Amino acid sequence: MVDDVISKGTSPECGKSLTYVGPSPCDLSHGYQEPIGMTVYKRRFIGVAHLALLNIVVSWGWVTYPAVPVTSAVFLNVSVNAITWLSTGTLFAYCISAPFVFQTVERLGLRGSNMITSVLLLVGNWIRYAGTASEVKNYGVVMFGQIIIGLAQPFCLSTPSKFSESWFTDKGRTSATAIATLANPLGAALGQFANPYLAKTPDDMPRMILIISSISTLAIMPSFFIPSKPPTPPSTAAAVDRTGLLVALKDVARKRNFWLLSLPFSIYVALFNSTITLLNQAVIPYGATEEEAGIAGGILIGAGLVGAAILSPLNDKFKWYMGTIRSFLPITCAMYIALIFAPASTLGIWPTYVVCAILGFSSFSTLPVLLELLAEITFPHSPEIGSTISWFGGQIFGAVFIIAQSAMVAGPSANPPYHMRWSLTFAAILSAVFLPAPLLLTLVDPGALRRREQWHNTSLETARDSA
């Protein structure tokens, strides 16, 4: 049902309040488009909730085994490093399917993208369950299931910006993008919190996988019923005709300000992926239990969700994009440095909890802002182009970082054995190296921001002048 109508400008023919897309109705020159009434629908909330649900279960699938690395290793009769590879394999699988998101959304729409996510999730989860059954315990089958889940992830993680532009006005886009996007790390938080309690012993592993697979099966059902876009667009930005894929990619590749955002975005996403994957191994050598390590991971994500919930509505209203980035990215960098020392603190696990809370709050506060800025910079191209490229970089760098940081684990003769001090130092250095780039965005190109709003205002002025 329609819950709100946004009226901008006046038709000179009938006097009806409408928002014009392109020139005035009096302009019969090339490129004339009929005016379109801009409308938003209540069903958009169902759509964003379902997209969030898909991101929750796909991320929960990613961290299923790394959340309980020792228990998983004992059950599958493999090393802890092999369990880490279940996470790494998922990230590499993401990179295989990510390039297909562009054509999928263009040809099948958001509904088609969600359906592909759902089918792959269904198949991947139940293959994992088959590999984890007590009679089988086959690491290869489990890895195959993880890879299929990884193939599903880009079809729901790269599309929130597209969904928010298709269904929401500029007063709600940042919040909608945040809800759907940050549901992905929420799924990882659920895994960090719940899995140590669902699988307290190796014999509990089949039951844990059965529960996760059942929840995922229920979560995918609405994919087949939610449409790709509303009957009428919510804003002029959503109504713009998009350029072809190859033209868009060539144009985006030439935008310096795009790379100033996209590359740091990819690096910071990769650092989060490696941190959430290796956090257990970073704190356990200092005496923490798997449950305490899981709580640390949950705090990392939970505090981030709180930060995003506070700042996303404020950014929708006040557009504090650059202020948010300049305030919170340096804090994020400082917390990666603090994480080097927190696990070894004589105060136990509590300093790690504090660092994880601040790191999560600052990281997640900037994530939806960065995605919205990417959509602004790449406009009038489709929003999923910038987000897919950036998420692709985050996943592939994340996989590389996990491999590199796993190789930096200290040996059995270290104090304490198998500590990850050098791995955490590696992450801190990377966060510092890529910090300056996004802070320089408006200095390099002052017109990079709010281009959709500028185009929107220009359209209204054209309509009024013609009237």
What are these regions (language model features)?
Residues 2-60, 65, 74:
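Cytosolic juxtamembrane N-terminal segment immediately preceding the first transmembrane helix
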Residues 30-41, 232-261, 458-467:
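Juxtamembrane intracellular "pre-TM" segments in multi-pass secondary transporters
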Residues 65-66, 255-311, 401-402:
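Extracytoplasmic gate region of multi-pass secondary transporters
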Residues 96-112, 306-320:
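Helix-to-loop junctions at the C-terminal end of transmembrane segments
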Residues 143-183:
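Cytoplasmic helix-loop-helix junction between adjacent transmembrane helices
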Residues 172-200, 216, 391-402:
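Glycine-rich segments within core transmembrane alpha-helices of 12-TM secondary carriers
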Residues 206-225, 421-440:
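Symmetry-related core transmembrane helices of the 12-TM Major Facilitator Superfamily/SLC fold
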Residues 319-370:
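C-terminal transmembrane helical hairpin of 12-TM major facilitator-type secondary transporters
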